[in-house]
Amino acid sequence: MIIQQWSLLKKTKSFEFSFEIGGFYSRDNYKIFNQDRFIIIQNMGAPGLITDANKIEISDLEWDKFWNRIDLLGVWNWEKDYIDKGILDGIQWELMIDKKGRKRRRIYGSNKYPKNFEALTNLINEISKMNGEIMGYSED
């Protein structure tokens, strides 16, 4: 029993995931992150003001599928920043993924997105059970 608990604790502490997207005073500002095996979803009406929050337990199998798809999307090879300097306001986003002891990336964007960003937002919608609430922006 103790070995099973240690194995579970070790697995849940082996990664971090965080994704934020939204615009200044937009009603669709989201922060989605893991807390051990759980996904925490915060909807912020204004910067720093949480208007709604949910906590969903994610199975080990779902987490394994999530990380496999992160690998398939090539997110580890994305640029550090995607910024459209011609637009001063709009949509900003940030992704932080950390496979403890293996890989870590923090990627930021402002009105610009990697080519397969929409596939990432679909994946995040899927694991967070948000039914498409995060819009799938894409680079044209």
Sequence positions of predicted segments:
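Aromatic/basic micro-patches that form nucleic-acid/chromatin recognition or nuclease catalytic surfaces
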Residues: F66
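Generic short beta-strand segments
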Residues: I40-Q42, L72-V75
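Short, solvent-exposed coil/turn segments at beta-strand boundaries
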Residues: K31-I39, K100-G101
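Acidic/histidine-rich, surface-exposed loop or edge segments in extracytoplasmic proteins
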Residues: F38-A53
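Short, well-ordered, aromatic-rich surface patches in folded extracellular/luminal domains
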Residues: M1-G22, I56-E57, L61, R69-I70, ...
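Hydrophobic/aromatic beta-strand elements that line small-molecule binding cavities or substrate pockets
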Residues: D28-F33, A53-I56, W93
